[in-house]
A protein has these predicted regions:
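S1/OB-fold single-stranded RNA-binding interface
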Residues: 42-46, 54-56, 105
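Short acidic-glycine loop/turn motifs at beta-strand connectors
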Residues: 49-52, 131
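Conserved strand-loop elements at the edges of beta-sheets that form or border functional pockets
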Residues: 49, 59, 119
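Basic, glycine/proline-rich low-complexity segments that contact nucleic acids
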Residues: 1-42, 63-188
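Beta-strand/loop nucleic-acid-binding surfaces
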Residues: 52-64
């Protein structure tokens, strides 16, 4: 495709912000609001620290406004609390798991998903991802305890092409996508 403007426009003014695990330790934060984000499949929770700083995290199932979220070591094993993988017992569902310590969370972030802590091996922890794949991570990587909210979003089928069009439009995606073999070579 040649010339002109982009085929799609991303409505980024509607996106509330990035959802990452904050780089704080030993803090207790309060959920001030639950926010719908068109670009995320799970709801976001606006969380406020005692010093007034605010950030977004992906909301776990059962999270509500006014709930306390503990961040750091030796926290209670309640859904929504954030701690290191080495502190979480085996068999516990976790979400928003960091790939490297301090990166903010990379795994098990879509609505209704969770990873499971399989085994703790000293300086590394093995988790089972939602795909079923086993992954070894550093024991200092942090994760949120519990299952993510927003499950059941795929239960309602897309009955019309228009529904798929508006879903893609909200996320800034192009719909429908034409396969390359159906185009002229010059139009790729």
């Amino acid at each position: 495709r040649r010339g002109s403007s982009p085929k799609n426009r991303v409505r980024s003014h509607r996106f509330p912000g990035k959802s990452k695990v904050p780089r704080v330790e030993g803090e207790v934060a309060t959920v001030s609001d639950l926010v719908h984000s068109p670009v995320h499949t799970a709801p976001l929770a606006r969380v406020r620290l005692d010093n007034g700083d605010e950030f977004f995290i992906v909301a776990t199932e059962g999270m509500g406004v006014g709930q306390k979220v503990a961040i750091g070591d030796n926290v209670a094993l309640r859904p929504g609390n954030i701690t290191k993988l080495s502190q979480i017992p085996e068999g516990t569902p976790v979400n928003n798991v960091e790939s490297r310590p301090g990166d903010g969370g990379k795994f098990a972030r879509s609505g209704g998903n969770s990873a499971v802590v399989e085994s703790n091996m000293g300086d590394s922890v093995r988790i089972r991802l939602p795909s079923g794949r086993l992954k070894e991570l550093h024991s200092d990587c942090r994760a949120t305890i519990g299952v993510l909210g927003g499950h059941g979003r795929t239960d309602k089928p897309m009955m019309k092409a228009g529904s798929a069009h508006y879903r893609a439009k909200a996320r800034g995606k192009l719909y429908p996508t034409v396969s390359g073999v159906a185009m002229n070579p010059v139009d790729h």
